Amino acid sequence: MRLYRDTFRPSPAHAKPFAILGTHVICADTDEEADHLAKPVDLNIVRRAKGECLPLASLEDAAAYDYTPLDRARMAQNRTPLSVGAPATVKATLMPLIEATRADELMVTSMIFSHEARKHSYELLAKVFKGA
């Protein structure tokens, strides 16, 4: 984003640069619950690495999957770009990223199988950043 801001040229449509940061967030009431909700994402990471492009798995499918040690290593490595946790945890992971990129807006996706849990994740995240 630094390059974008450094080379930005005003236009009739945009007088100044405006950057949107896109990221993945799974937010729940507790870190443990958020980690549990992220298990289907872990399984999708494993499946995609094996060339399997399937819809987001359910919590039950993720729990029943027979993970290899390589699968587990891949899951741990790919959790890094995700913000997973309770509201305070998610804020603590996102704020340095927002500050470093000087993002004007945050665009979030939440790959959560349950519609209600996904909606709750967005509600918690909205409370975290309301007035921030």
Language model region names:
Residues 1-102, 130-132:
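An alpha-helical appendage that flanks or caps ligand/catalytic pockets
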Residues 98-132:
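Generic C-terminus detector
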